[in-house]
Amino acid sequence: MAIERTFSMIKPDATKRNLTGAITKMLEDAGLRVVASKRVWMSRREAEGFYAVHKDRPFFGELVEGMTSGPTVVQVLEGEGAILKNREIMGATNPANADEGTIRKVHALSIGENSVHGSDAPETAAQEIKYWFSDTEIVG
């Protein structure tokens, strides 16, 4: 498998509970390397822009409120098959359906407060990385 990069986000429900280190450790223990990271407090505009794909979904307003409720850690991860590996480590969106030992099974509070986000494909990874990071901020 090729070395690739993916986007990862530790959401406010997790940062408020001081889980940034624990979640990052789970990612690193799985063989992913953090090549960029920053802590941000999303504005409403940033959250609406980042999640624009969901703007017509019934949960959009609640999603934006949650994402602007506290600090978020945005990261670029690198490794073999990083996109799939990150999604496997995160677990199912609904923590009730997540496999044992995944981030969401261990740390998520609910489907709405599921602690993490990760890119689902190479195209979205590139788009999401570019949304939060300039090329000079990514240090391999």
UniProtKB/Swiss-Prot annotation:
UniProt keyword list: ATP-binding, Cytoplasm, Kinase, Magnesium, Metal-binding, Nucleotide metabolism, Nucleotide-binding, Phosphoprotein, Transferase
Binding site for ATP: 11, 59, 87, 93, 104, 114
InterPro entries xref list: NDK-like_dom (IPR034907), NDK-like_dom_sf (IPR036850), Nucleoside_diP_kinase (IPR001564), Nucleoside_diP_kinase_AS (IPR023005)
CDD domains with a match to the protein in the record: NDPk_I
Catalytic activities: a 2'-deoxyribonucleoside 5'-diphosphate + ATP = a 2'-deoxyribonucleoside 5'-triphosphate + ADP; a ribonucleoside 5'-diphosphate + ATP = a ribonucleoside 5'-triphosphate + ADP
Enzyme Commission code(s) on record: 2.7.4.6
GO biological process terms, semicolon-separated: CTP biosynthetic process; GTP biosynthetic process; UTP biosynthetic process
Localization: Cytoplasm
Cofactor(s) essential for the protein: Mg(2+)
Enzyme class: transferase
GO cellular component: cytoplasm
Record-annotated active site: 117
Subunit text: Homotetramer.
PANTHER family: NUCLEOSIDE DIPHOSPHATE KINASE, NUCLEOSIDE DIPHOSPHATE KINASE DDB_G0292928-RELATED
Family to which the UniProt record says this protein belongs: Belongs to the NDK family.
Protein name in UniProt: Nucleoside diphosphate kinase
Annotated source species: Rhizobium etli (strain CIAT 652)
